[in-house]
């Protein structure tokens, strides 16, 4: 069996958030088809993809994410990360709604982890143990390029990955 180093824990966190946004009718992926594309663009994207996203779907709301791995000390079998979501929209109320939903989804420590574990991809090697809100910055008073505003929320979470019982290396 070959270890998949491409699949990272933040994929599951982003998937859980996108599912929740769709379930609450806050994002409709049918609105995210660019001309000539057969599949919608995912509105949760790394900062490097923002120029292309804005060129293909100008004016659409999107979420920029960034992930930082945190030190867990000698508990090497556990991992912790902080993911930051920067909601970018032209609608202040929409930004606040997204922040409120993200807060509600991820503020419940082990209960939030249970929810994320229930929507994992069958290929996910991860198990999540807790989530917590680190900080939430409401809608910024200034406007970014193109009339966009933004709001920021940071979430920390703990997880483990399937490992070889003898070597401790990822499976």
Model feature map: region roles:
Residues 1, 19-20, 74-78, 158-160:
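Interface-prone segments of viral and bacterial extracellular assemblies
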Residues 1-71, 112-116, 170:
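Small/polar-rich, solvent-exposed N-terminal microdomains that initiate assembly or binding
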Residues 13, 17, 21, 63-65, ...:
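Hydrophobic beta-strand residues in large extracellular and virion-surface proteins
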Residues 19, 30-31, 93-100, 104, ...:
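Polar/charged alpha-helical tracts
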Residues 71-72, 92:
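Short acidic, S/G/P-rich loop/turn micro-motifs used as interaction or catalytic elements
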Residues 72-78, 143-148:
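Short, solvent-exposed beta-strand/turn "edge" segments of beta-rich domains on protein surfaces
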Residues 77-95, 100, 149-161:
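Oligomerization/assembly interface segments of phage tail-like spikes and tubes
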Residues 106-168:
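Acidic-leaning, charged glycine-interspersed low-complexity segments
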């Amino acid at each position: 069996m070959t270890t998949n180093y491409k699949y990272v824990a933040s994929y599951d966190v982003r998937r859980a958030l996108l599912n929740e946004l769709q379930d609450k009718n806050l994002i409709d992926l049918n609105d995210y088809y660019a001309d000539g594309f057969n599949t919608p663009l995912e509105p949760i994207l790394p900062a490097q993809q923002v120029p292309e996203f804005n060129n293909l779907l100008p004016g659409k709301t999107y979420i920029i994410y960034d992930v930082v791995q945190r030190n867990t000390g000698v508990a090497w079998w556990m991992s912790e990360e902080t993911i930051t979501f920067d909601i970018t929209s032209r609608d202040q109320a929409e930004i606040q709604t997204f922040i409120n939903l993200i807060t509600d989804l991820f503020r419940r420590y082990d209960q939030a982890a249970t929810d994320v574990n229930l929507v994992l991809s069958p290929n996910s090697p991860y198990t999540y143990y807790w989530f917590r809100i680190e900080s939430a910055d409401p809608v910024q008073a200034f406007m970014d390029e193109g009339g966009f505003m933004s709001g920021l929320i940071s979430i920390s979470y703990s997880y483990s990955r399937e490992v070889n019982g003898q070597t401790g290396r990822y499976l």
